[in-house]
């Protein structure tokens, strides 16, 4: 072969080499292989206690790869279970789990009516499971996919209370000794200090005889409690109080005004969601920080309060607002307007919802505080990788995805019990028998 033939052969081969190389590079740069959702499983359990927990397991076409999400709703449990099994499951199977945003949007629109709590619970379970899958595929915790850690641990506030001021002081000091810097204090239960005892007071003939809530009595009782705590414990502990939406407009304004000298970290749910306009009145008269959002399920409940800076903390529950995808967007909105997060994770909340909040909180500069939840030992056994609270901080496992799993066999041994009164939330009443908003 002469020089000219050699050159011709070489030149002719160049495109072939380039194409082969390009194909090899393209194959290597495609990343992970495509996935589909192969099956969807609904898991329910009482958590070995009084809980009514609902979880979703999204199983992919890759052997051993699945995600877990929470659909927790203690009060309409079976409605959520039916929505997951009968409506979401057949719609979700066969879809691409990598398309989290598209699946969230289309899952919301598939019901036509949207933003209700049951539908949001369904969205949340799917969304958390998809983020769990995404993190496991990337071999990264979800918080790394959200931008990485913005802090080393997530501070949580402790729950305390007592029947008297002295009992409340003892409880506060116990929390501080255990490393908590933020403590929520209640005088008895929700509305405590504002109840007329059973059968006492002027009541309608043949009417309601149970403990009766009185707004003015409550407004008179709570400020002296926190004045006492500040006098005895000083201004070091960051104090929180939950009104639990028991007050109407001007009584809420008056309580906020009276609590200003106590320098509260915040007052929680001082107004019911039907009377949010009164937050403007509170802002105009005092600087007592306000937190709200526990029962919110629609973004338009949140946006006006945040953009007008009428509140200081947003207290949405991740599982009630649709999951990690929408709550991360809400957190970004709050950051722009200087509002902080205080996600609601106590009470009947579950470990998966708690750890989903953790991933958002640890990666956000809008974070303020997270509510604690102490689970019994059986729950720690049932949920490998459960979050751990130590000295006032919540820590995740650091494993890929959400970093938490569920022991399905143990969950099955602790099934949901009978539903009392249809799962209804308890109702407080006034002395004349009228319903008090929770």
What are the language-model segments listed below?
Residues 37, 64, 88, 126, ...:
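Conserved, mostly hydrophobic/aromatic
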Residues 61-62, 66-137, 435:
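Metal- or metallocofactor-binding catalytic centers and their adjacent structured scaffolds
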Residues 153-280:
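Metal-dependent enolase-superfamily TIM-barrel catalytic cores that perform enediolate-based chemistry
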Residues 18-49, 66:
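C-terminal segment of N-terminal export signals and the immediately downstream linker at the start
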Residues 86, 102, 257-266, 272-401:
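Shared catalytic-loop signature of beta/alpha-barrel
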Residues 3-24:
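N-terminal export signals
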Residues 402-438:
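Extended hydrophobic packing segments that form well-structured cores
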Residues 54-62, 387:
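Short beta-strand elements
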């Amino acid at each position: 072969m002469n020089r000219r033939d050699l050159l011709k052969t070489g030149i002719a081969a160049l495109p072939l080499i380039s194409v082969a190389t390009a194909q090899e590079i393209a194959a290597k740069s495609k990343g992970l292989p495509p996935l589909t959702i192969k099956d969807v499983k609904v898991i329910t359990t009482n958590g070995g206690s009084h809980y009514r927990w609902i979880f979703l397991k999204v199983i992919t076409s890759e052997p051993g790869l699945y995600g877990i999400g929470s659909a927790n709703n203690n009060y309409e449990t079976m409605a959520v279970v039916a929505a997951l099994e009968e409506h979401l499951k057949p719609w979700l199977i066969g879809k691409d789990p990598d398309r989290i945003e598209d699946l969230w949007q289309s899952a919301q629109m598939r019901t036509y009516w949207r933003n209700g709590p049951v539908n949001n619970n369904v969205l949340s379970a799917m969304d958390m499971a998809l983020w769990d899958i995404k993190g496991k595929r990337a071999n990264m915790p979800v918080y790394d996919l959200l931008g990485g850690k913005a802090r080393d641990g997530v501070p949580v506030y402790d729950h305390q209370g007592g029947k008297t001021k002295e009992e409340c002081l003892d409880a506060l000091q116990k929390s501080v000794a255990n490393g908590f810097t933020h403590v929520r204090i209640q005088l008895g239960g929700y509305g405590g200090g504002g109840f007329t005892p059973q059968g006492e007071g002027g009541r309608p003939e043949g009417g309601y005889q149970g403990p009766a809530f009185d707004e003015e009595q409550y407004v008179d009782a709570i400020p002296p409690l926190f004045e006492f705590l500040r006098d005895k414990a000083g201004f070091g502990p960051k104090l929180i109080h939950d009104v639990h939406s028991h007050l109407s407009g001007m009584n809420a304004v008056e309580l906020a005004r009276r609590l200003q000298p106590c320098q509260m970290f915040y007052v929680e749910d001082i107004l019911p969601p039907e009377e949010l306009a009164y937050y403007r009145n509170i802002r105009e008269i005092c600087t007592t920080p306000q937190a709200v959002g526990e029962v919110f399920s629609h973004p338009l409940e949140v946006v006006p309060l945040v953009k007008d800076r009428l509140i200081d903390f947003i207290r949405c529950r991740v599982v009630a607002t649709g999951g990690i995808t929408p709550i991360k967007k809400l957190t970004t909105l709050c950051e722009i307007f200087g509002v902080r997060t205080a996600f609601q994770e106590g009470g009947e909340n579950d470990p998966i919802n708690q750890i989903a909040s953790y991933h958002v909180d640890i990666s956000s500069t809008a974070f303020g505080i997270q509510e604690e939840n102490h689970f019994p030992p059986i729950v720690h056994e049932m949920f490998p990788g459960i979050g751990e609270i130590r000295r006032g901080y919540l820590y995740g496992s650091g494993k890929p995805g959400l970093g938490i799993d569920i022991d399905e066999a143990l969950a099955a041994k602790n099934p949901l019990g009978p539903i009392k009164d249809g799962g209804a939330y308890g109702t407080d009443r006034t002395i004349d028998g009228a319903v008090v908003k929770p």
